[in-house]
Amino acid sequence: SQKITKRIAIFDIENGLNQLENFPYHDYPLNQVRGAHHNVISFMSDQHPVRNYSEAKDFIKRTDLVKDVFTGQLDWLRKQAAMGIYAPEFVYDHIINQLNELINYSADEHPLYTEFFKKVELLNISESKFSSLDNNLRASIETSVTPGFVLLRDYMVSTKAKANKNHGIWSQPNGDEFYKLRIRSYTTTNFSPEEIHNIGLSEVARISARMMEILTSLGYDSTKTAGVLMNELNEDPSLLYADTLN
């Protein structure tokens, strides 16, 4: 098992190095499911420990750096833009909406504030220390966190006209080669995109045919497709549990 683990590790590292060396700016560091704007909130809210007063102060020291973090992210995005790489239009729409939501939070509503004080309220600290944390985090959100999100939002708005009209990575500079690398990473094969596509079509046809054999043998309508029949099965009351508490 150690030999297999080693081979997997080497495979992953080689693919990662290939991407870093040949496609360093083909990723989308801001998108609708992940990115710096998500990571800051999730790390600070869910992972950063606040088990004592010292850690609470450390939390605020880090929120003071959010604007710097996003400034660094902007430098990366500008280098990506210099290569002619922009995220697809639908990504822009989601990101701008998400950033506007984060910008429009008041301090009392901000997830960094609310999650932080859920933890602080469990600490045995004096009222003066509690008040100090409250004032400092409010100031940090106002001077670092929100301005950082504004930086990202303004960049996305200013470059939206250049957003990629296509969704596929193939449409980016040297995108076909990057796509081949991602296929290799995901499938662990050296198949071409065309071969992978044809395998997919073949497997869908094979599985659908076998499903139809089973469904028609059970008396289901053979004139309908496997997909239609599966949807009907999912909605058949006789095959569903009742909506009860038990």
What are these regions (language model features)?
Residues S1-N246:
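N-terminal maturation segment of proteins
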